[in-house]
Amino acid sequence: MSFWHNTKSIVFIATVLLISLLSPASILGASAKNPSEGNKLKESKIQSYVSDMQPGWNLGNTFDAMGEDETSWGNPRVTKELIQQISKQGYKSIRIPITWDHRMGDGPDYKIDPAFMDRVEEVVNWSLDAGLYVMINLHHDSWIWVHQMGENRDEVLPRYQAAWTQIAHTFKDHSHKLMFESINEPRFNSGWGSEDQTHYVHLDELNTSFHKIVRESGGKNTDRPLVLPTLETNAAQERLDELYQTIVKLDDPNLIATIHYYGFWPFSVNIAGFTTFEEQTKKDITDTFDRAYDTLVSKGIPVILGEYGLLGFDKNTGTIEQGEKLKFFEFLTHYVQEKNITHMLWDNGQHFNRTNLKWNDQDFYELMRASWKTRSATAESDLIFIKKGEKVQDTSINLELNGNKLTGIFVNRNKGDKLHKGKDYTLSGNTLTLKASTLEKLTASGQYGDNAELTASFNKGADWTFDVILHDTPKLESAAGSADSFAIPAAFNGDRLATMEAVYSDGTNAGPQNWTSYKEFGYAFTPSYQSNEIKLLENFFNEANDGIVNLKFHFWSGEVLNYQITKNGNEVTGKVTSN
């Protein structure tokens, strides 16, 4: 995973459901427990190993970077202090993605740069010293050169084997808490989502070759845990079935399966109107991990979710609205753990700041940390909008308590002023009602935007924060510019943009991804609250026809504004139209 990961969109938009043709079999001892079914079966040793890795973290965009060194993709040089802090944050395992391509010499030896190997070993040792389980792999090599296996097998396979021969030799005496992953997100063409049966043959050959090389390299590699991916690390049924067959064939009690998950694609990138964590997004989670459990875990093959996150994060972590993002991670973490699958957060530097060693979004971390042990309560929204000039009304919000009890509501995050139940708010079942008098006091400043934060605390799990926002209808203005730098002046008046629709005069969808009128946030358009404008990005105009395009901007308050642009080559003009 890295900044180009959104090229996989077609994979996530249509998950294939097939009926497994495999008969139940256990190759690694007793089946692992499934907490959701109340099973209390004894775990195999390798399942216990994987369970002890929970939770995990990825050192992304560092050794997998394809520049001159580990800093070439913008992250600082890895320090021992960083690794120690990851352990202190509660993580039990670390995945260190590594791209070897430009660190290897020519054939037939394909010698790896000794200085680079030494540096990788140094960070691996720091991680082991910090008490972490460690996973290393071949990372972007998968799409740089390994994907050519079909047409260039005689070069790809020896190079792959040479890489693992050298890696296995270097680490053969390291602790068993170090594991090897054969290849990251393997694919065998230039795109994603291929179902060509020959690709399964190629992956089976790579995994089998990897297994043989490591096992024959001696030392602790004779029984070191090895991690094998599905095709593209995707959890479609056929891909799980194919990996199952490979693992059965290898007949080795120290094998682990791995998949990746970045959510239901429309929600993950904020497209097609999927702005909230709704039932279809939730069902994608349950379907995915039910398949992984039924096909692998229930048959004694442990599974590591080697990467997870949201694809919109590649643009910025605000692509998905904060509360909706938190609900996604709360439920995902809960469900993956319920299926006895270990999860490893993908972090390319956008989550844990590697310079100041602090979380960029503390709420995100606090919710994840709480979810490692229990469920957290959430709400239907974290946004409470009060429209300026209108009479303030009582506001009701449905809570998703997840078995918890509300213990108090406080003004701001320091929990200084506590609201009084009955006077300031009421709770009836799962419905929280904030009194009009309370909201009126909180927005008395008359200033647009965030006026207060209300922190709801519960007997267990993380807090839930509501933003109390004073707003008015946003105002847009006429604009003129070019397709590579067009922006609409906008007075947001405290409101926040949720999504944008685009259609031609005949009603057909305009711009990229024209199967939907709702465009992708951060790809086709983006708001700038600092410069007070909505930018229509070059990606949008690259796939928009000349002529009139009618836009509709949807805001989180419920406000909807119409706007019309006219494109003539590279020239673009825009004007407000009536709602």
Label each region the model flagged.
Residues 415-435, 514, 519-530:
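Extracellular/luminal ectodomains and secreted, surface-exposed scaffolds of diverse proteins
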